C-alpha cells in the first residue's frame, strides 16, 4: 500500500477501471511514461478505486462491492470507487460498458467476452505464487489496476512490497504452502468474481495449472534474485537514506531466495497432487506440506518495518527492504 499524500489520482494513462480504476489505494500522479509499455493514453479507461486521507491511508472502499468487481446495479453512482478514480477521462458510454462487463462477469456467462482469459490467468499465476495478502486476494482488496478495452477486462500488478507473506505475518510454512486453488486469505472466492470464474470452470482451472507448471519450470528464481541483488547491492550499500542496514538487506535476499525455492517446491507438489491445492485439503492432511520453519518472513520486511517498531502511516516504515521510495514509481 502506498503512503502518498495526494487525495485523488489525476487522469492518466490508457484503459483500465478499478485497478487502473484502482479500487481503493489511490495512486499518486502517474504519467503515461511510467505506465507499462503500451499503456499510453487512448480512448479506453484506466483507474484505481479508492481515495486517501491526509495521512496517506485509504478513506474507504478497500472491501466494497465495486472494489471486489461485483455487479451491483446499472447505476454508475454505485461504482464510485471505480469511476471517481479513473486514470483517463471517461464518458457515460465508458461507464455503461464497464457495468455491463461486471454484470456478465458476476453472472459467470461467456467469460471470454468480458475477460482477457489468457492475461488474467497468467496474472493470477504469478500473483498467487508470491502470496500477497495486501491485494485483491487478501484483506486490502483495492491494490490492483484493472484494464478495460472494448468491454474486456484484465488486471495490472500494483503494490507488491508486502508480498511473500510479509503482509499476513503468518507462519512461514503456512505461507509457503498457500493453496493455489483457494488463494483467498480473507473472505471467499465467491465475492471475488475476477478470480472465481477460473475455479468455476474445469477447463480454466486446468489452464491455470498448466500456466503455473510452465511458470515454475521456466523461471530460475535463484538466478534472478542473485543477479538482481548483485546489480543493486553497490547502491544499497551507499544509500545515505537507507532505512535498513546492508546486513538486513543481505538477510532479506537470502530469505527471499529460500522462500521462492520452497514455494516452487510446494506449488509443484500441488500441481502433481502430492500436496493438496485447497485450504480444506491441507487442513485434512498436512503431512506433505513443505517445511519452511527455517526462514523468517519478517526478514523480507513487514507492515511496521524493522527500524523503530510500530506502524507509522505515511512513512517509509510501511515498506520492506529494497522497496521503492514513496512516490510515482510503479511496478
Language model region names:
Residues 1-331:
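Phosphate/dinucleotide-binding and metal-coordinating scaffold of catalytic cores
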